[in-house]
A protein has these predicted regions:
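Transmembrane signal-anchor/signal-peptide helices with a preference for the extracytoplasmic
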Residues: 15-34
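C-terminal luminal/periplasmic domains and tails of membrane-associated envelope-modifying transferases
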Residues: 31-140
Length: 140
């Protein structure tokens, strides 16, 4: 009877510590996506999401590395068409939007145009239209 109670208390303590540890990791998006990458280093989405959060933290060089890695991983031949389309489009759209923020409109459009024509995803088409509009406004 006592052994059972000790076991229950021990399990409760272990689970409590694990919960606190996980809450800490999830309390900041960078910790969350780094953990996701540790668990699934060959998936493009965690790399893309980590890059997006680096952008929010104004760490552009880390964001660019993450978006480029996400693109490479998404292009792996073992991925389905939908995985490739989504992974490449999202990462390249993020890179193009970053370039547009820097005023590099031609470079951003050159990056997006082939992706837009190949995969035809709405967010890429919308980003292309937005960058084109920003370029027009900037040139006036």
């Amino acid at each position: 009877m006592i052994v059972g109670k000790v076991l229950v208390v021990a399990l409760f303590l272990v689970w409590s510590v694990a919960t606190v540890n996980q809450v800490f990791r999830w309390s900041h998006p960078l910790h969350l996506w780094r953990q996701a990458i540790e668990e699934s280093p060959n998936k493009p989405r965690p790399w893309n999401n980590l890059g997006a959060h680096y952008l929010l933290d104004r760490a552009e060089h880390f964001a660019i590395d993450c978006f480029q890695r996400s693109t490479r991983l998404a292009q792996h031949p073992d991925r389905s068409y939908n995985e490739r389309a989504s992974g490449v489009s999202v990462a390249q759209t993020n890179l193009a939007l970053l370039e547009a923020q820097r005023g590099e409109y031609d470079r951003a459009l050159a990056r997006l145009t082939p992706v837009m024509h190949l995969y035809k995803l709405q967010e890429t088409i919308a980003a292309h239209a937005w960058i084109t509009r920003q370029k027009t406004i900037a040139s006036q």
